Amino acid sequence: DVNNISYSLMWKDGIKNVYLAKLSSIQKVIKMLANKHSKEAMLSLTHGQPATPTTFGKEMAVFLSRLNKQCATLKGLGLECKLSGATGNWAAHHIAYPNINWIRLTKKFISRLGLKHNALTTQVECHDSLAEQYHLLCRINSILIDFSNDMWFYISRGILVQEKVGGETGSSTMPHKINPIHFENAEGNCGLANALLVHLANKLTISRMQR
């Protein structure tokens, strides 16, 4: 009971003060690009082939809109917790203090922590609400992968130009190059995170009997 509440509070704090804070800085940059280049015309590609005109700003606005929607959903999701004893029946609680309404008391306590009360559980909280957040993070990460892919192609097409950073080596044999390594790393890191999040979402929601 203590652990599921403690971990939920840590996760909640991490999402708010680390993940969403970092993501907000990315959203601000994309918003700046969308506004600054709203009239910068370029040729769009469908299936990798020349299509119709678009603007760089509009394409950035698409990613901003997608991220904004998912972030709003994430902020609205709550984490469920339990405080109902060894097998979720408040048995020991009731034996010790039979005159207390334990369901109402534990709900009030958990709500005060900014969490949601799950009254029907086994020994462990089912983690469905946590899995829901994991899946949503996967969607956000997939949007970031899509963004990184497109930025990689904009650089390749010469639409965007990278600035050389002192101390960075573009290539072991071609030092004149500036490879889009940060976007490539972002793809890999987000993909790895998604693999772990999907596994955790699938694993944590399965429990043998009461545990």
Language-model features: locations:
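Conserved, well-structured ligand/cofactor-binding cores
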Residues: 2-211
